[in-house]
Amino acid sequence: MGLIKKSKNVTTAERDLVKRLTKKCIKEIVKVKWEILGPSSKRLTMADVWDKLYLKIKCKGQRSYGGKNYVCIDISDFRKGRTFFTEYARIKSDPIIGEMEFETSEDALLALIAHEVAHMIHYNYFIYTPWLRGGDNTPHGQSWQKIYRILRRELVNTNKARLAA
């Protein structure tokens, strides 16, 4: 298991929830059908990702982020009970990966975690995965969006409360 760190103001229950949702995202994206590869064209497994992961959970009203074997989640909106998940301008209008109202704050938290796990997977594995190599590999580019789209479609958007058009 990788390293999990929580800020002093984060409860054990909140830490465990973020850990569970992070694992859920990783388990989905390493499924055989998505063909995410690691070094030497080896199919990625849960252990490959989880054992290297540094997961940090904080509650400071700051940004969350994901990168090289690293995911940092700020749970402030979750703790406030917010169910609306905002996205960056580049993707906010996308019907699958855009901004969305969810039924519960836990669902909105899952959307946040999926966003950051997508960054971590993209950063570490796009170079090894043929279907990710060809696109725009910027942080919110086409390749990252492909990963994020899988996570949102398969895990997150199943509990959305669609916004009125």
Can you say where each PLM-predicted feature lies in the sequence?
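Walker B catalytic acidic pair
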Residues: 116
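Active-site-proximal or metal-binding-adjacent scaffold patches in catalytic folds
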Residues: 1-111, 120-165
